[in-house]
Structures are given as structure tokens and as C-alpha cells.
């Protein structure tokens, strides 16, 4: 007994599935989680505990939780900026989220500082400018060049066709 505590709900966020690229794989895994949440709700009800809130869902999975009939709220938030890693996640039509359902809202402007090495350019956006804990950035609107590595202050861009010039903006 804890008279000052009120049980108000469940937190059922499945964080490790948020960045699963394949839509069908995410759905399969979320269906299993939703089933477990239903079992938990049934158990709570059988014990006389009301569960008004079931919270969970994220940018990569909210459609599954929202349509489950089990969750009362979703916690998606990364969609507001749509980072590159969430952008790589595929929707039900097999398209990247950042090229279908969501659009990028936050960008980093970088300049090319060097093109001394054939097939490679150096830009001024490294680790001090961006986070790479969920993968390297994607160069917006450019499928012909690829950001391949970075140090504290510089990024390396693969430019196989040697198109980039010093002071080009990306």
C-alpha cells in the first residue's frame, strides 16, 4: 500500500526498433510488443488496476502503435528535424522516410576547403558541428557525392567525378 502513489499507466516504448530500416521487420517486431502490452493490460485489469495511459511509439514506429488500439499516446519527436538516420528508415512503400512521409527541417551549411586529392573533397563540418552517433550525415539533394568520414573539424566527401570546387556550399 502506498496511498500517495497513483498508478496511471504503462511506458511501452521500444527504442531499439526505431531505426530498423525495413518496414515489415519493424511491423513484425512491434506486433510482438503490442501483444505483450495487451497481456500486461489484461493482467493489470484482472488485479483491479485501471491503466488509463499506455505510452510509447517513436518516429520509426508510431504508425504501428497509433493504429493498435492499445496505445493512448505516442512519443515520436525526432521527426521534427528528421535526422539522416531516421531518413534511412523505409515506409510501407519501401521509400526513405525523408523522401516520402517527412521532410528535413534542420540543415548544416558547410563549405569545401580542399580538393587536393583526386575523388575527394574536404569540408569544414566535422564532429564539432554534427553528431555521428547514428551514422554519417547525408548531403541533402546530392546523390552523386557521399560524406564518408570526419575528424573534429573536417569532413571527407567522396566526389568520384571531381565536381566540387573550393568554397562550394553544401
Over which residues does each language-model region extend?
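Active-site loop/helix belt of alpha/beta enzymes
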Residues: 1-95
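Charged (often Lys/Glu-rich) extended helix/loop segments that serve as interaction or gating elements
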Residues: 82-164, 169
Amino acid at each position: 500500500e502506498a496511498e500517495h502513489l497513483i498508478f496511471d499507466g504503462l511506458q511501452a516504448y521500444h527504442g531499439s526498433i526505431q531505426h530498423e530500416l525495413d518496414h515489415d521487420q519493424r511491423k513484425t517486431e512491434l506486433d510482438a510488443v503490442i501483444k505483450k502490452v495487451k497481456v500486461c493490460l489484461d493482467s493489470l485489469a484482472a488485479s483491479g488496476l485501471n491503466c488509463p495511459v499506455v505510452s510509447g511509439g517513436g518516429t520509426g514506429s508510431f504508425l504501428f502503435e497509433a493504429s493498435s488500439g492499445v496505445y493512448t499516446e505516442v512519443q515520436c519527436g525526432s521527426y521534427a528535424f528528421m535526422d539522416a538516420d531516421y531518413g534511412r528508415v523505409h515506409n510501407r512503400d519501401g521509400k526513405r522516410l525523408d523522401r516520402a512521409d517527412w521532410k528535413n527541417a534542420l540543415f548544416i551549411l558547410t563549405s569545401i576547403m580542399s580538393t587536393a586529392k583526386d575523388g575527394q573533397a574536404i569540408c569544414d563540418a566535422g564532429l564539432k558541428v554534427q553528431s555521428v552517433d547514428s551514422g554519417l550525415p547525408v548531403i541533402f539533394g546530392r546523390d552523386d557525392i557521399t560524406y564518408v568520414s570526419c575528424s573534429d573539424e573536417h569532413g571527407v566527401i567522396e566526389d568520384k567525378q571531381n565536381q566540387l570546387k573550393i568554397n562550394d556550399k553544401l
